[in-house]
């Protein structure tokens, strides 16, 4: 093929993307045609000339990752996946944005083959990609050997003005530059338009200088519609191994639409039939909607090339298995997300024999002891903290800070809670590592949307959230969580653990690590908490999220508590016993898991008709659904105060005497 023919082919391939996007949005009567049309050449050059992938196997471990951070441009990705040969037939493109279709409004992991991450909240895809690139670097350092580059791929990102306006982009890109993630390549769709109009009025940053200051390699002022310029920029980016690269692509939003290109009206609404007809005429595109000319379909088909690339890697991996059998076995185990046999043995031994884990201990310290036992058995654990390591106690003796060379198992994320959480999602998405990260519970608000995305994507991610209540004392209401546990419990598919002692903390960690279909939040105390004795059945029932910790014959009331308030409930039960009132105590470290149990078990723990009192140093409205209309929820429905912890518990009425008195009043009113 000579140069003019190649240019013509490239243009037709790009136009196929334009028309599939425009026609799908038109049929759906909603969507975002402008960005897919403006990024068509960017996509054509990357996907046809650079991206290493195999449509027949979207899970090939050494594939390049592609992230569409500006997820509203989803029809661009669907068109690419269809044209290159993924299992996404044209019938699904026709069903764009329809119920149960494989082409939802924004890309969703697990719904569409070839989609690497769920995107839509701007900036999060970019931060996910930072996590993916970090995972690639760490795994390459772990598994590659001379002559055997088993882990050797790039992470590519498409992003727009909106992604860069989000504060998350600063957190993630600053971290990427610091860690020198040289195989992260971002293509910036610099079209100068957002929903409200021209961004010059609200986004006048010098983006190239901004990223240069982060330590990135910047390729500025690339014509985003010039295939040759884009190709050259990508070659330059791939040659840069020590710094992430930003390619600034000047584009026209909605390019190809004769009357609407370049304006904000094309961002988030169908073009309209007359405009699409005019575009077909202007671009000489004779194919009917949802039809791709044979020559264009052939030019896009990546199945043979993808199969050949994976076959070459497989052959190399076979040789790797022969040369490094133990490493190869470990690589396969971790790539498949399987935990090693007996990984929990040392931790369980701490519960079976006298150990500090069974003493009076802050649950944040208990968590650290759990990690000390687990880390040697789980090399895939990748820890970290948002500059609170000494407070969260997320590090262990075996922790090695991640360095520029990609060695280590602990990331100092800096004061970047949102960036940490979103990067952890990317690490989990990549595979081969299980990320956990720590911050103060009150700062989980910074991370919340990334935690929500982890729940939506069903990712194994662990958030260590310490200083969980007024128990942290004098730092005051800015640092004392009140509504946070309830807020996190509201996220579907998120499990929130608030353990009361070392044993519950150990079971919380085991549940979080064994959980393959969603994130877990470990809500841990600053202050030391009393341990509780349990028989084997009680200990096993911790894993069910809620269980009877103290039982009595013919109980008249059930006291339900979590975390540091379990001790208060136990002491209140003793006070009630002195008054002749039999009280059962239920510890409920994970409400979501408890309510996932069968009704029969739940009724044995919380017998219907028995009055209930809940005790938690946080908002009470969540617990009203647990205790019922006739029950009583004790907690804190205002902000905290700055004072010693003991004074605060007295001030807010969270003492054994207060709880016992409330239970007596409840029984008198029943």
Curated annotation (Swiss-Prot):
Residues that hold substrate according to the record: 32, 267, 364, 391, 467, 475, 526
Q: Which reaction does it catalyse?
A: D-sedoheptulose 7-phosphate + D-glyceraldehyde 3-phosphate = aldehydo-D-ribose 5-phosphate + D-xylulose 5-phosphate
Query: Residue numbers for the site described as Important for catalytic activity?
Result: 32, 267
Record-listed thiamine diphosphate binding positions: 72, 120-122, 162, 191, 267, 443
Keyword Cell division on entry: no
Any idea of its EC number? 2.2.1.1
Q: Which CDD domains match?
A: TPP_PYR_DXS_TK_like (cd07033), TPP_TK (cd02012)
* Bound cofactor: record note: Binds 1 Mg(2+) ion per subunit. Can also utilize other divalent metal cations, such as Ca(2+), Mn(2+) and Co(2+).
Q: Which GO terms describe its cellular component?
A: cytosol
The residues the record assigns to binding Mg(2+) are 161, 191, 193
Q: Could you tell me which PROSITE patterns the record lists for this protein?
A: TRANSKETOLASE_1, TRANSKETOLASE_2
- Going by the entry's taxonomy, the superkingdom of the source organism is recorded as Bacteria
Family to which the UniProt record says this protein belongs: Belongs to the transketolase family.
This protein is called what? Answer: Transketolase, chromosomal
Q: Which organism is it from?
A: Cupriavidus necator (strain ATCC 17699 / DSM 428 / KCTC 22496 / NCIMB 10442 / H16 / Stanier 337)
Q: What is the lineage of its organism?
A: Bacteria, Pseudomonadati, Pseudomonadota, Betaproteobacteria, Burkholderiales
Q: Gene symbol?
A: cbbTC
